[in-house]
Curated annotation (Swiss-Prot):
Coiled coil: none annotated. One of its GO terms (cellular component) is cytosolic large ribosomal subunit. It comes from Sodalis glossinidius (strain morsitans). Gene3D superfamilies: 6.10.140.1970. GO terms for molecular function: structural constituent of ribosome. SUPFAM superfamilies: Ribosomal protein L29 (L29p). GO terms for biological process: translation. The keyword Ribosomal protein applies. CDD domains: Ribosomal_L29_HIP. This is Large ribosomal subunit protein uL29. Belongs to the universal ribosomal protein uL29 family. Pfam families: Ribosomal_L29 (PF00831). Keywords: Ribonucleoprotein, Ribosomal protein.
Length: 63
């Protein structure tokens, strides 16, 4: 997910996206802890996407 794509979304859409990412992160962490996760790079990608969305929400709140 690109930051430019996220910048076009409204704050409500970003909150929805954040909720989806946090759910996905939880599921990936559960899979990793049980040894079922084959693609461990997804944890890093989702964590960074969460950070991107939170950053944009903070920017929009300040603007």
């Amino acid at each position: 997910m690109k930051a430019n794509e996220l910048r076009e979304k409204s704050a409500e859409e970003l909150n929805t996206e954040l909720l989806n990412l946090l759910r996905e992160q939880f599921n990936l962490r559960m899979q990793a802890s049980s040894g079922q996760l084959q693609q461990t790079h997804l944890l890093k990608q989702v964590r960074r996407n969460v950070a991107r969305v939170k950053t944009l929400l903070t920017e929009k709140a300040g603007a």
